[in-house]
């Protein structure tokens, strides 16, 4: 089985919150696909609560699109990591990490402005596979920590494990 790119970086050196351009690739028609690591917590030190990360998934999907999408960049997907330390975001285009950082911080401010769980998008049994597993408070706590700490930018080359450098 091939080793995935995400396992070629030293997770013990990852700061958080931080954004990292994990990889870029070209489609057969020449479009650029960029994959970003949005690391909310330090790996193996802390993890996001299951209700908090689930609610954040619903909120960040729309907010990041509002702040990052433009004529040259379109978010394909933002998915939580199985380790519950962050999200992977795939986009058509090549935004730089600083644009992603600004969009992420703006999105966290948007999360803090949500007043009621009824305002969480797709929070119903028809559009969500676990509609009871949400917490606006926990998502807002996550957003506040991101804003309090500030988002930094990681360099993938500096994080490569020596066998892959």
Swiss-Prot record:
How does it associate, per the subunit comment? Homodimer.
Q: Which GO terms describe its molecular function?
A: iron ion binding; S-ribosylhomocysteine lyase activity
Which positions bind Fe cation?
Answer: 54, 58, 128
What does the record's cofactor remark say about binding?
A: Binds 1 Fe cation per subunit.
Query: What is this protein's function per UniProt?
Result: Involved in the synthesis of autoinducer 2 (AI-2) which is secreted by bacteria and is used to communicate both the cell density and the metabolic potential of the environment. The regulation of gene expression in response to changes in cell density is called quorum sensing. Catalyzes the transformation of S-ribosylhomocysteine (RHC) to homocysteine (HC) and 4,5-dihydroxy-2,3-pentadione (DPD).
Q: Which protein family is named in the record?
A: Belongs to the LuxS family.
Keyword Metal-binding present in the record's keywords: the answer is yes
**Per the record, what are the reactions this protein catalyses?**
S-(5-deoxy-D-ribos-5-yl)-L-homocysteine = (S)-4,5-dihydroxypentane-2,3-dione + L-homocysteine
E.C. number: 4.4.1.21
Tell me the SUPFAM superfamilies matching this sequence: LuxS/MPP-like metallohydrolase
Query: What gene is this protein a product of?
Result: luxS
Q: Which domain of life is it from?
A: Bacteria
Question: What name is this protein filed under?
Answer: S-ribosylhomocysteine lyase
Q: Which InterPro entries match?
A: LuxS_sf, Metalloenz_LuxS/M16, S-ribosylhomocysteinase
- Cofactor(s) for this protein? Fe cation
List GO BP terms, alphabetically: quorum sensing
What's in the keyword line of the UniProt record? Answer: Autoinducer synthesis, Iron, Lyase, Metal-binding, Quorum sensing
């Amino acid at each position: 089985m091939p080793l995935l790119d995400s396992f070629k970086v030293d997770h013990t050196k990852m700061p958080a919150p931080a954004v990292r351009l994990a990889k870029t690739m070209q489609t057969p028609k020449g479009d650029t696909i960029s994959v970003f690591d949005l690391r909310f917590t330090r790996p193996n030190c802390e993890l996001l609560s299951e209700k908090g990360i689930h609610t954040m998934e619903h909120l960040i999907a729309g907010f990041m699109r509002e702040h990052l999408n433009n004529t040259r960049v379109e978010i394909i997907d933002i998915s939580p990591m199985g380790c519950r330390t962050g999200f992977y975001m795939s986009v058509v285009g090549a935004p730089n990490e600083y644009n992603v950082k600004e969009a992420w911080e703006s999105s966290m401010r948007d999360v803090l402005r949500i007043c009621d769980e009824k305002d969480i998008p797709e929070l119903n049994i028809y559009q969500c596979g676990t509609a009871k597993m949400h917490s606006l408070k926990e998502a807002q706590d996550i957003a506040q920590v991101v804003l309090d700490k500030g988002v930094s930018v990681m360099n993938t080359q500096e994080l490569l494990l020596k066998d892959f450098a």
